[in-house]
Amino acid sequence: MATQRKIIHIDMDCFYAAIEMRENPALIGKPVAVGGSVEGRGVLTTCNYEARKFGLHSAMPTAQALKRCPNLILVPVNMPLYKAVSEQIHQIFRRYTDIVELLSLDEAYLDVTDCRQCSGSATWIAQEIRDAIWNELHLTASAGIAPLKFLAKIASDQNKPNGQFVISPENMTAFIYDLPLKKIPRVGKVTNEKLAQLGLHTCGDIQHSDKAFIYKTFGKFGQRLWEFSHAIDNRKIEANRPRKSLAVENTLPTDIWHLAEAEQIVDELFKKLVFRLQRNWGERSLQEFKKLAIKLKFGDFTQTTLERTTDGLSRERFIELLQQVWQRTNRRSVRLIGLSVHYPTEKVKKQLNLWE
């Protein structure tokens, strides 16, 4: 019998805002957001839990945030500091394992299957890591521990902030059976509503469904949905994996038929893409990102992707791609639009060097 894996998902608690409060204790207990401007331009990068009580969240327009929370304290982004602290956290991870998959500055998977520290207990390893982050860096982290990658990520959100949750091999089957499908990665509002219309609310419902029907109805994602609902997730923790691309997409509440509607959606997606690029990798000229792609998924769940090398990342270039790929609709409705960008080759190499 194969060895049961021990996977930990670590997620820092409102990372950027927490660092700012650590650096300036006068901010503690007050609603704080990182990013945006007092003039109301831009969007929030993140905010602390006091601000979230007012309904604030990352990527919210600053003007809207200030209306909801007039006393909101805005702090400028300090990416060099966040990166330095992130590297300190990564060094703590590597005291226990070299199999670390970095998802962003504040999130990572760890495979501790072969770790002998803490008598091999993944639960105690996660606790020690969180204790070290607090004692050495005065920041809090949440953790999820499970035999499967997707379950570890779900578990890290169960007792947030500053907590951890364990899904053991013994209780994994029961946990998955009752798990709401909206908790599955990539099941957004629209997909969840479609599932609900079919009477599918939990993984248990998927288990009692017809496999061919799930595959046909949800396409490639149907396979992932079926496998997760049956406790199948063979994805490895990809140590030292540099991110080669970044994508954003929007599954639409209702299908669209017209190019003008799609252009409006691309406008919003482009803003999100730039926001995420700046959040994860700091200030970098958009002209350095030359390999762009756009994806359309149609009402029949088939999809098409168009990729081009251009003179730089811009809204106009994505609109041009959209106009070209729209010719492939063949009178079909569109239910999803996605934008993606590949990092420059030297950027990928630099990430790899940092993580080696």
UniProtKB/Swiss-Prot annotation:
The record marks 16 as: Substrate discrimination. The lineage of its organism: Bacteria, Pseudomonadati, Pseudomonadota, Gammaproteobacteria, Pasteurellales. GO terms for biological process: DNA-templated DNA replication; error-prone translesion synthesis; SOS response. It catalyses: DNA(n) + a 2'-deoxyribonucleoside 5'-triphosphate = DNA(n+1) + diphosphate. Signal peptide: none annotated. This is DNA polymerase IV. Monomer. NCBIfam families: PRK02406.1 (NF002677). PROSITE patterns: UMUC (PS50173). The gene is dinB. It is found in: Cytoplasm. Pfam families: IMS, IMS_C, IMS_HHH_1. Binds 2 magnesium ions per subunit. Mg(2+) binds at residues 11, 106. InterPro entries: DNA/RNA_pol_sf, DNA_pol_Y-fam_lit_finger_sf, DNA_pol_Y-fam_little_finger, DNA_polymerase-Y, DNApol_IV, IMS_HHH_1, Rev_trsase/Diguanyl_cyclase, UmuC. One of its GO terms (molecular function) is damaged DNA binding. Belongs to the DNA polymerase type-Y family.
